[in-house]
């Protein structure tokens, strides 16, 4: 990793928000924007940004809560529950746009987790010129209203034993996307719980390794 550390970004509405940037020593030409889970810019996502940089990605992980909680990283003591209901898809898209503007030109992908997974998928229907959108265990309901508008490839990495969303909802989403002719891939990890990649990595090493490989393959294939 050539460089990494916290940065302060400004969204389109003038809001300052926290982010974490990691730059590769050997760039692949690809960019990644990380959308965290409900905890916001938890230290896990700073470490993940560095991991993407090690794989050649210019990477920025964003925080959601600049408008309601100010700036700074979010450790385990952060009370995200009072802030998460105030986060809107429009604000997330604007914040991601500010993150993209920080990166060099090149194919840019989003990857999100839980709450961020759904928002990452939604970006595939938005105005940002992304090469693809990746999401771990996002809720299908978060993208139900934009399915016809999806224009960019999706990678969906699903926990087979997700406590938040029954498996049949993901299977229904997979069928609906196929009916609409949308470019998507869905992998369901049997038995894996919600947050298996970001909170249960040690117990689900094989699933996490497979998901990482799929991300690298997906981004290589869609980098253009």
Which role does the model predict for each range below?
Residues 1-224:
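N-terminal cap/leader regions of alpha/beta-hydrolase-fold enzymes
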């Amino acid at each position: 990793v050539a460089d990494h550390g916290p940065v302060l970004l400004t969204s389109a509405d003038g809001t300052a928000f926290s982010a974490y940037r990691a730059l590769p020593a050997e760039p692949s030409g690809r960019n990644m924007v990380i959308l965290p889970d409900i905890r916001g810019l938890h230290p896990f996502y700073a470490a993940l940004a560095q991991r993407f940089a090690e794989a050649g990605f210019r990477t920025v992980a964003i925080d959601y809560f600049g408008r309601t909680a100010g700036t700074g990283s979010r450790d385990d003591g952060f009370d995200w529950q009072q802030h998460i209901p105030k986060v809107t898809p429009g604000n997330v898209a604007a914040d991601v746009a500010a993150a993209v503007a920080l990166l060099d030109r090149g194919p840019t992908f989003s990857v999100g987790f839980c709450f961020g997974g759904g928002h990452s998928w939604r970006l595939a229907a938005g105005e940002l010129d992304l090469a693809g959108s990746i999401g771990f265990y996002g809720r299908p309901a978060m993208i139900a209203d934009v399915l016809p508008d999806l224009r960019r490839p999706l990678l969906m990495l699903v926990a087979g034993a997700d406590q938040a969303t029954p498996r049949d909802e993901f299977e229904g989403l997979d069928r609906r996307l196929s009916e609409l002719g949308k470019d998507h891939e869905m992998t369901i990890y049997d038995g894996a719980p919600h947050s298996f990649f970001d909170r249960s990595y040690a117990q689900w090493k094989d699933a996490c390794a497979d998901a990482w490989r799929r991300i690298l393959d997906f981004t290589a294939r869609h980098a253009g």
